[in-house]
Design a protein with these regions (language model features):
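Central cavity-lining transmembrane alpha-helices of secondary-active solute carriers
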Residues: 57-75, 291-303
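Structural signature of the two symmetry-related core transmembrane helices
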Residues: 85-99, 315-331
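Glycine-rich segments within core transmembrane alpha-helices of 12-TM secondary carriers
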Residues: 146-164, 387-397
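Juxtamembrane intracellular "pre-TM" segments in multi-pass secondary transporters
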Residues: 2-17, 202-255, 445-452
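Helix-loop boundary and gating motifs at the non-cytosolic
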Residues: 6-64, 249-290
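Hydrophobic core of transmembrane alpha-helices in multi-pass small-molecule transporters
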Residues: 27, 97, 108-124, 342-361
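Intracellular juxtamembrane helix-capping segments at the cytosolic ends
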Residues: 123-136, 360-374
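Helix-to-loop junctions at the C-terminal end of transmembrane segments
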Residues: 69-82, 167, 300-314, 405
């Protein structure tokens, strides 16, 4: 999900009727996302009888497909000046892509399904927020975006809850219910697409991404679909040489966020497989674990904004990264300890869930830091590069984590993750962030003061 912060000049627009009815399609698409978000490790390990190595491969390849797809769809939307059609393509295309699960009886056919899904699903990602902004007066942006975020999050949690209930009730039919969840998700996407076709308006005006330099997207949920569900700024090769070049400090900071995301994925990708393999975790346990992660992230979101204002960026980032290092270190120690499986499983589920609490702090602090380090006219370009490099970090971390965990061990993989994050934390703490501050902005639907 995404939140906005910033201020941009915009003209007066005609107020569409029943505009909050638009959000129904986004609600349904997030329900579908919640249903499928925990399924990759479950499908690969339980349904396909494979291992953590191939969970990493499936995760990284599907993530890799999303990066060029995001850029392609975003550029095509901007070139054609259309928004609604791409949301419909994303939702209806996801319906057809997920139905391919009926052919996914081997790893590579499953990966193929994920790739097709990512390519078509990304059609809606770079346009969803713009469609809302383009149909809303600037003074209403905070309220509209707050409601959009709330609706999207409700959909995500509803999907995870529904998945948890379904998989618990039909626990004895695992080999049927796992692919069936994809089919259910497909039809929810179909309903989202039909709803979008009926109720979504086309944009009343056009906002150029390059002029939205003070509007940024925060990733409230760290790993949904392995990529943001909505972004404003996308990376464009042809724009990198236009205007003033990015400052070295901005580029270096973005590279460090990529390194840290790489470290996060070294932990996140193998961990569900670890508790399945070593503790006998059930499908319900995995769904609960993902649900807790997302709930903790949402709980912390407003607190994170307050932390940046009160403590400052450096302390917020340091506190969050050090907390994650400590938690991952504890997880690595647990892999070498002999403890009763029951308590160890509950501790592990809580560890994974609680990690989501710190993502909100990290996400808001990173985006705010980049906006402060960048030249005002380059902020949009910098955020686009940041979004792309987060994807690169996720891809690389997902790919390598499976091999490390399978060939050397889960404990070693978690230790490597903690070390990588520690190195990134040390380097990122050296940045001076006392640069000219941002103007007034929007955060969770409220005007916020300048970030200290």
């Amino acid at each position: 999900m995404e939140n906005s912060i910033g201020n941009v000049n915009a003209g007066v627009v005609r107020k569409p009727k029943s505009k909050y009815l638009w959000f129904m399609s986004y609600l349904l698409s997030n329900v579908s996302g919640g249903l499928t978000s925990p399924l990759i490790p479950l499908f690969v390990v339980i349904y396909l009888h494979s291992n953590v190595e191939f969970v990493g491969i499936a995760s990284s390849i599907s993530s890799a497909a999303s990066v060029p797809a995001l850029i392609f769809w975003g550029n095509l939307s901007d070139s054609l000046g259309k928004r609604k059609i791409f949301i419909v393509i994303g939702f209806i295309g996801s319906f057809f892509a997920l139905l391919l699960v009926i052919f996914a009886h081997m790893l590579w056919t499953y990966v193929g399904m994920l790739v097709v899904f990512q390519v078509v699903a990304m059609a809606s990602t770079p346009v969803s927020t713009l469609l809302i902004l383009e149909n809303t007066e600037e003074r209403e942006w905070p309220t509209v975006m707050a409601r959009f975020n709330t609706v999207s999050y409700i959909g995500l949690v509803a999907g995870l809850l529904a998945g948890t209930i379904i998989i618990t009730i039909f626990a004895s039919f695992t080999m049927i219910i796992l692919p069936l969840l994809y089919v259910i998700s497909a039809f929810v996407y179909l309903s989202a697409g039909i709803t979008a076709l009926v109720v979504l308006p086309e944009s009343i005006r056009r906002l150029r991404r390059s002029r939205l330099n003070n509007i940024y997207s925060f990733r409230m949920v760290e790993r949904l679909r392995y990529f943001p569900t909505g972004v404003i700024h996308i990376f464009k090769f042809r724009n990198m040489k236009k205007g003033k070049p990015l400052l070295p400090r901005t580029r270096n900071y973005i590279l460090l966020t990529c390194l840290l995301m790489f470290g996060f994925q070294l932990f996140f990708v193998p961990f569900p497989v670890y508790i399945i393999d070593k503790m006998g975790a059930s499908e319900t346990d995995i769904f609960i674990m993902y649900l807790l992660n997302n709930v903790f992230s949402a709980i912390a979101f407003k607190m994170a904004g307050a932390s940046v204002r009160v403590l400052g960026l450096r302390k917020t980032i340091s506190f969050s990264l050090l907390s994650r290092i400590a938690i991952i270190s504890v997880a690595s120690l647990l892999t070498f300890m002999i403890l009763p499986v029951g308590p160890l499983l509950y501790i592990s589920i809580f560890i994974y869930g609680f990690m989501g609490f710190f993502w909100s702090f990290i996400s808001i602090a990173w985006v705010t830091s980049i906006s402060k380090l960048a030249l005002p006219e380059n902020r949009g370009k910098s955020i686009g590069l940041y979004n792309s490099f987060l994807g690169i970090g996720q891809i690389a971390g997902s790919a390598i984590s499976g091999f490390v965990a399978y060939d050397i061990g889960y404990g070693f993989d978690f230790i490597v993750a903690a070390v990588v994050i520690a190195v990134g934390a040390i380097l990122i703490s050296t940045f001076q962030l006392h640069t000219p501050e941002l103007g007034k902005g929007y955060e969770t639907g409220k005007a916020v003061s300048k970030t200290p």
